[in-house]
């Protein structure tokens, strides 16, 4: 047995499970966390059949696996599979982190906390007291809502292509918003044209699928002016078309690479009880993306 084989044999096994999953940067992120913290972690990719997610997870745990990160298209199935859910997983209606505890499968959703930590810690933008515009009302937006509310912004506006879906999503968070003193408003994307400049926002978060399709959400330019942070949950070697548009309008921009690293750090903390430093890992990933762009 080689030294590498020996270290893997004595390391606790974790995976990111999805379909497809070959593109995932999670193994590189968690390998960096393990080196930094000295934790004995082996982290791999696991592609599950589209009709075999639950069986793949159960088999992984039966073979001694410690935890899973869950990516598309299995986050809703992970929610159903978990025996125990955290409050934020219940609020999100989806799970991206699984682990075994006392024989039960536990599920959490670290996407939203990853988002707010990236915005507040890495981008130095305090959310408390700010006005936030959230574009989209799908799973990504659902996962962001409770962590955003817990930051106590003054107002969260949700705008979605289908207005009723935005309103329905906000209904799920009325109680939490009341608890934290947050005003909620939701409607269709076309309703943004009716906002006055007095109703300008401080942070615009694109949680819609528009960037996947190379589309720019119909956001009035005055909402993306100087002093506004425009954030896209997507990331890539090139800025998304939304971020390019926002930059032309004068906004400060950021993609979702930091969110990816921060949600991974939260999962690592859940599993290992050690919170890794994210800044050096984010810098490594950013450099890798820039190298891909030049290549």
From Swiss-Prot:
Pfam families: SDH_C, Shikimate_DH, Shikimate_dh_N. This is Shikimate dehydrogenase (NADP(+)). The active site is at 75 (proton acceptor). It catalyses: shikimate + NADP(+) = 3-dehydroshikimate + NADPH + H(+). SUPFAM superfamilies: Aminoacid dehydrogenase-like, N-terminal domain (SSF53223), NAD(P)-binding Rossmann-fold domains (SSF51735). GO terms for cellular component: cytosol. Pathway: Metabolic intermediate biosynthesis; chorismate biosynthesis; chorismate from D-erythrose 4-phosphate and phosphoenolpyruvate: step 4/7. Keywords: Amino-acid biosynthesis, Aromatic amino acid biosynthesis, NADP, Oxidoreductase. GO terms for biological process: amino acid biosynthetic process; aromatic amino acid family biosynthetic process; chorismate biosynthetic process; shikimate metabolic process. GO terms for molecular function: NADP binding; shikimate 3-dehydrogenase (NADP+) activity. It comes from Cupriavidus necator (strain ATCC 17699 / DSM 428 / KCTC 22496 / NCIMB 10442 / H16 / Stanier 337) (Ralstonia eutropha). The keyword Amino-acid biosynthesis applies. Shikimate binds at residues 24-26, 71, 96, 111, 235. It is an enzyme of class 1 (oxidoreductase). NADP(+) binds at residues 87, 136-140, 160-165, 233, 256. Belongs to the shikimate dehydrogenase family. Its EC number is 1.1.1.25. It comes from the Bacteria.
């Amino acid at each position: 047995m080689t030294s590498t084989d020996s270290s893997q044999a004595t390391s606790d096994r974790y995976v990111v499970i999805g379909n497809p999953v070959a593109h995932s940067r999670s193994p590189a992120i968690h390998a960096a966390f393990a080196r930094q913290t000295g934790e004995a972690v082996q982290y791999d990719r696991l592609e599950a059949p589209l009709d075999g997610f639950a069986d793949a997870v159960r088999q992984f745990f039966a073979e001694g696996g410690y935890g899973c990160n869950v990516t598309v298209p299995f986050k809703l199935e992970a929610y159903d599979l978990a025996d125990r859910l955290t409050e934020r997983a219940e609020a999100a209606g989806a799970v991206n982190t699984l682990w075994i505890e006392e024989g039960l499968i536990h599920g959490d959703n670290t996407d939203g906390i990853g988002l707010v930590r990236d915005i507040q810690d890495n981008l130095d933008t305090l959310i408390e007291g700010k006005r936030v515009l959230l574009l989209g009302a799908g799973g990504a937006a659902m996962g962001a809502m409770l962590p955003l509310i817990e930051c106590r912004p003054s107002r969260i506006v949700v705008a979605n292509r289908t207005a009723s879906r935005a309103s329905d999503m906000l209904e799920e968070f009325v109680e939490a918003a009341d608890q934290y003193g947050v005003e909620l408003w939701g409607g269709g994307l076309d309703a943004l044209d009716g906002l006055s400049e007095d109703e300008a926002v401080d942070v615009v978060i694109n949680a819609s699928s528009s960037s996947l399709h190379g589309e720019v959400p119909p956001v009035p330019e005055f909402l993306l002016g100087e002093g506004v942070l425009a954030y896209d949950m997507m990331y890539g070697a090139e800025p998304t078309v939304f971020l390019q548009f926002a930059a032309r309008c004068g906004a400060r921009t950021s993609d979702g690479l930091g969110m990816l690293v921060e949600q991974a750090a939260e999962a690592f903390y859940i599993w290992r009880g050690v919170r890794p430093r994210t800044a050096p890992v984010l810098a490594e990933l950013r450099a890798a993306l820039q190298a891909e762009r030049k290549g």
